[in-house]
Regions:
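Signature of N-terminal electron-transfer/Fe-S-associated modules in redox systems
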Residues: 1-150
Length: 150
């Protein structure tokens, strides 16, 4: 099936297998490997992207369902190789260890901050509740998102 999708401001037209998941289309067909595949079942959130402005788990959507959509992946955050404020806050607050969950956490946090520039700690925790981190215990992640909101 032929689809046209805009990812990180660039429009792609591709023929895709109707059974192909969006995450595999993004990573394997377009070579945008910043989003991670953790579970392929929608549980971990490592594959979170912004889909028409909403945070979604890209392992839960078929690529053909993205026809006509606008998608932002973690690659959209940095410009000219420089970290954006959210990425810098994650670095400054040691909000990552292994880094596997980080792309999904960043995109969930971006979605929150796009909707609410000054979220409470409770709102931050709710926004990232679909993202699993087995390393940090979430404290530094929450602190990083708070710092990025200032």
């Amino acid at each position: 099936m032929n689809i046209t999708v805009t990812i990180n401001g660039e429009t792609y037209e591709r023929d895709v297998d109707p059974r192909r998941l969006l995450i595999h289309f993004i990573r394997d067909d377009l070579d945008l490997t910043g989003s991670h595949v953790g579970c392929d079942t929608g549980n971990c959130g490592a594959c979170t992207v912004l889909f028409n402005g909403d945070a979604i788990k890209s392992c839960m959507l078929l690529a053909v369902q993205a026809d006509g959509a606008t998608i932002e992946t973690v690659e959209s955050l940095s410009a000219n190789g420089e970290l954006d404020a959210l990425q810098q806050a994650f670095s400054d607050h040691h909000a990552l260890q292994c880094g596997y969950c980080t792309p999904g956490m960043l995109m969930s946090a971006k979605h929150l901050l796009d909707q609410n520039a000054t979220p409470t700690e409770g709102e931050i925790r709710k926004a990232i509740q679909g993202n699993i981190c087995r390393c940090t215990g979430y404290v530094n992640i929450v602190e990083a998102i708070k710092a990025a909101s200032k």
